[in-house]
UniProtKB/Swiss-Prot annotation:
Gene3D superfamilies: Nucleic acid-binding proteins
Protein name listed in UniProt: Small ribosomal subunit protein bS1
Domain S1 motif: 39-100, 118-184, 205-273, 290-360, 377-447, 464-533
Entry GO terms, CC: cytosolic small ribosomal subunit
Job of this protein: Binds mRNA; thus facilitating recognition of the initiation point. It is needed to translate mRNA with a short Shine-Dalgarno (SD) purine-rich sequence.
Source superkingdom: Bacteria
Keyword line: Repeat, Ribonucleoprotein, Ribosomal protein, RNA-binding
Record's keyword annotation contains Ribonucleoprotein: yes
Pfam families registered for this protein in UniProt: S1 (PF00575)
Organism: Rickettsia conorii (strain ATCC VR-613 / Malish 7)
Biological process per Gene Ontology, one example term: translation
Family: Belongs to the bacterial ribosomal protein bS1 family.
Repeat is among the record's keywords: yes
GO MF assignments: mRNA binding; structural constituent of ribosome
């Protein structure tokens, strides 16, 4: 029993029987206080208020002293209050009590119940810490992670600080004294209900007002209040927009039309250009194919240049349609942004929203004029513009080039060797061999200025003719031969016999005559390609035809013997 109680009751008993008083005092000493434990909340009575201290009796040997500052509302003597027992007996023998901790214990209990039920708790964001914010839950401090502040990043968090607002308790650890709360969960739940309501009303064709929430390369996300929609780059304007940031700003208010609603995936596609009439509906009439007009260069691309047809509408001039003579040239080299150019309409594709234009077709094709003045067979003189490994390029005027392939330089000599004898700037004579206006190519030749020396040979030694030739050289790859002492010929190793073991050049001797069949003539060199094998096969087939089939009683050897005898 506390000393104060003794002081209050024992003197009053002094008038009583001394023995009774002594027994009563002992009884008070033996009052059971075992149910009172440290770190628990108990009820106590205020027995005295002294200066800044409130003395509370909780039924222990000693009273406890609590600073007035721990009480929000000051109690009076005799009031019963809940207190937290820190220590039953401190260093000075007094019981250490705390009203503040008792309140927190009570609040913790309430918060635990609310957390288990999923109920929201009111609190105030009052400070910033690493990774988030601190929240006052009526006396208990909780942690609000940065990721749980809002459904989207907040640039200025001061707008939500020092305001009483609801939070959801995510986790509690009484041992560590940690509470984690979420503001975002409240917003999401509220947003989810509003979102479901909004989605139930969404219909294609609806016009809504929203706020630009995010801008990407492919479009912008529009906040419609409780749900987001995607405004694709191609649905911002009927004209060309390279990037959404060219016409939209973050947090900008915009009017949009619902152009598609995917109910299954809850996706909303939005459009701004659909709020205006489609200019393409009248474009075919306004810009008919073949119409020649002028416009300003607005932008460049790897594949061409864009020209403004009218406000909000552009057409494309492909690289191949800029110049007649420089196919797929870089438009940046000849044109500048803002430059006024003349063009002609090639095609209007209303489905793909494309207008194809041409600059070069506003002028006469210089190659067409060249072809008219220099038909195939014409002999011209032109300066050498460039020399490559495969031929010579000559200047034809008006930035046109003609090409002499190395194979068209000489009938007899190798063209690649002759290229070294020509110099850039030299004027040479050549003949027009072919003109391809579509491909913008002019083929020329030098050797065609003189007759083909092998034409006579080609006429005399036609394919299939049987000739006799003199062996002039034996090589691993075959035999070099001479026909009529003037025309060179060659028999490949594989053409020496129809028997593989006889296809050996070393079996033949120089200056010996050999009979073979003309297989082909190399036009560039005039060399005749011959075949002994083809000749023998032809002879065999002829013999079979004249003397009968090998299925008869006469054997093949007899047939061939008879054929050879007749030849004699």
């Amino acid at each position: 029993m506390s000393i104060k109680l003794k002081q209050r009751f024992v003197p009053q008993l002094a008038a009583m029987n001394h023995e009774f008083a002594e027994d009563f005092s002992k009884m008070l000493e033996t009052v059971d206080t075992s149910h009172i434990k440290e770190k628990t909340v108990v009820k106590g009575q205020v027995i005295e208020i002294k200066n800044d201290i409130i003395i509370v009796d909780v039924g222990l040997k000693n009273e406890g002293r609590i600073p007035k500052s721990e009480f929000l509302a000051l109690p009076e003597v005799g009031d019963v209050v809940e207190v937290f027992i820190e220590k039953i007996e401190g260093r000075n023998g007094r019981t250490i009590l705390s009203r503040e901790k008792a309140v927190k214990e009570e609040l913790w209990g309430q918060l635990e119940i609310m957390c288990s039920k999923g109920e929201f708790v009111d609190g105030t964001i009052f400070g910033r810490v690493k990774g988030g914010f601190t929240v006052d839950l009526s006396g208990v401090v909780a942690f609000l992670p940065g990721s749980q502040v809002d459904v989207r990043p907040i640039k200025d968090p001061t707008s939500i600080m020092n305001i009483k607002q609801p939070f959801k308790i995510l986790s509690m650890d009484k041992k560590l004294g940690n509470i984690v709360v979420s503001r975002r969960a409240i917003l999401e739940e509220s947003r989810s209900e509003a979102r479901d309501e909004m989605l139930s009303k969404i219909k294609e064709g609806m016009v809504l007002e929203g706020t630009v929430k995010n801008i990407t390369d492919y479009g912008a996300f529009i906040d419609l209040g409780s749900v987001d929609g995607l405004l694709h780059l191609t649905d911002i304007s009927w004209g060309r927009v390279n990037h959404p940031s060219e016409v939209l700003d973050f947090n900008q208010k915009v009017k949009v039309m619902v152009i598609k609603f995917d109910e299954k995936n809850k996706r909303i596609s939005l459009g701004i250009k659909q709020l205006d009439s489609n200019p393409w509906e009248a474009i075919k009439e306004e810009f008919p194919v073949g119409k020649q007009m002028t416009g300003k260069v607005t932008n460049f691309a790897d594949y061409g240049v864009f020209i403004e047809l009218k406000d909000g509408l552009e057409g494309l001039v492909h690289s191949s349609e800029i110049s007649w003579l420089k196919s797929n040239q870089n438009p940046r080299k000849t044109l500048t942004i803002g430059q006024e150019v003349e063009f002609v309409v090639l095609e209007v594709d209303t489905e793909k929203h494309r207008v194809s234009l041409s600059i070069k077709q506003c002028q006469e094709n210089p190659l067409t004029k060249f072809a008219e003045n220099n038909p195939v067979g014409t002999i011209i003189k032109a300066p050498i513009r460039n020399i490559t490994d495969f031929g010579i390029f000559v200047a034809l005027g008006n930035n046109m080039d003609g090409m002499i392939h190395e194979g068209d330089i000489s009938w007899e000599d190798k063209g690649t060797d002759l290229l070294k004898s020509y110099k850039k700037g030299d004027e040479i004579e050549c003949k027009v061999l072919a003109i391809n206006i579509e491909k913008e190519q002019v083929s020329l030749g030098i050797k065609q200025l003189s007759p083909n020396p092998y034409q006579e040979i080609s006429d005399e030694y036609k394919k299939g003719t049987i000739v006799k030739a003199l062996i002039t050289e034996v090589k691993d790859e075959g035999l070099e031969v001479l026909l009529n002492d003037k025309v060179a010929g060659f028999i490949k190793r594989t053409e020496l016999s129809d028997e593989k073991d006889e296809q050996k050049p070393e079996m033949f001797q120089i200056d010996k005559e050999i009979e073979a069949k003309v297989v082909s003539i190399e036009k560039s060199t005039g060399r005749i390609l011959l075949s002994v094998k083809a000749h023998k096969i032809a002879e065999r087939q002829k013999a079979l035809k004249e003397y009968g089939s090998s299925d008869n009683t006469t054997n093949m050897g007899d047939i061939l013997a008879n054929a050879l005898e007749d030849k004699k």
